[in-house]
Amino acid sequence: MGSSLWTCLILLSLASASFAANPRTPIDVPFGRNYVPTWAFDHIKYLNGGSEIQLHLDKYTGTGFQSKGSYLFGHFSMYIKLVPGDSAGTVTAFYLSSTNAEHDEIDFEFLGNRTGQPYILQTNVFTGGKGDREQRIYLWFDPTTQYHRYSVLWNMYQIVFYVDDYPIRVFKNSNDLGVKFPFNQPMKIYNSLWNADDWATRGGLEKTDWSKAPFIASYKGFHIDGCEASVNAKFCDTQGKRWWDQPEFRDLDAAQWQKLAWVRNKYTIYNYCTDRKRYSQVPPECTRDRDI
């Protein structure tokens, strides 16, 4: 059986499994409802009344935008169509971050590549200023031809990274194991497109080909479903009352763990949990997150 047919059959079987804890599908609102540009305003193009935007990168600058509010817990998503063609050296990002020195951060970073070579999706989690929890996967589709939804479910129990409806990573609250978990620093949502050819593609060996500029990444789906808080707030005033706080979102169910296992087994190219040169002892959260 051909590998593409086998992949299709696996996807269909996973999609047909019943599960009870999928995040809600976000509604569509225009860019200006929840977001503002952060730099290089002239490198952002607005389409369809602001329901879609394009970020442009050239040899002079990239650009980006951020949420107006800060949030403690919720479900945060973005529909993104990545830079097509030769995107080597570029990074398209969607992430949450707090603003102080010992910051918390939840990252999606899409690392560009030469034409015909696949994108790499790198995820990372920073807690109390400590990161170094990179995981890298290939995607099972071409992310440049149409929009796909990338999202984060963040509550007191876990952080789940999703690609469309597929969980690709879980970071459990392992505070009892001595691992900090983001629970008291509100985060803003950031999106950006920039040049990172000193590291992004093959460790910096592949440089950005500026003859291909401008590089364009497209975004839509600007709804935010989170507990809005001031930057200095230490708790969500509706904690325990929102849909993402309910018992069915405190863990993945069997079907979701099956989907995650499929992604890990088929598409993982790096996982800090299994990097014995970097960590002689398995980081304590990895067992709970089923990463080993």
Swiss-Prot record:
Predominantly expressed in the phloem fibers of growing internodes. Expressed in xylem cells in the basal part of the internode. In the internode, it is expressed closer to the top of the internode compared to XTHB. Residues 21-219 form the GH16 domain. Disulfide bonds join C227-C236, C273-C286. One of its GO terms (molecular function) is polysaccharide binding. The record marks D107 as: Important for catalytic activity. Induction: Up-regulated by indole-3-acetic acid (IAA) and fusicoccin. Effect of IAA is however nullified in 0.25 M mannitol, which prevents cell expansion without affecting auxin action per se. Xyloglucan binds at E109, Q122, T123, N124, D132, R133, E134, D198, W199, G203, R278. InterPro entries: Beta-glucanase/XTH (IPR044791), ConA-like_dom_sf (IPR013320), GH16 (IPR000757), GH16_AS (IPR008263), XET_C (IPR010713), XTH (IPR016455). Its main location: secreted. Keywords: Apoplast, Cell wall, Cell wall biogenesis/degradation, Disulfide bond, Glycoprotein, Glycosidase, Hydrolase, Secreted, Signal, Transferase. Residues 1-20 form the signal peptide. The active site is at E105, E109. Gene3D superfamilies: 2.60.120.200. Coiled coil: none annotated. Glycans are attached at N113. It catalyses: breaks a beta-(1->4) bond in the backbone of a xyloglucan and transfers the xyloglucanyl segment on to O-4 of the non-reducing terminal glucose residue of an acceptor, which can be a xyloglucan or an oligosaccharide of xyloglucan. The keyword Hydrolase applies. Its EC number is 2.4.1.207. One of its GO terms (cellular component) is apoplast. It is found in: Secreted, Cell wall; Secreted, Extracellular space, Apoplast. Contains at least one intrachain disulfide bond essential for its enzymatic activity. Catalyzes xyloglucan endohydrolysis (XEH) and/or endotransglycosylation (XET). Cleaves and religates xyloglucan polymers, an essential constituent of the primary cell wall, and thereby participates in cell wall construction of growing tissues. Belongs to the glycosyl hydrolase 16 family. XTH group 1 subfamily. This is Xyloglucan endotransglucosylase/hydrolase protein A. It comes from Phaseolus angularis.
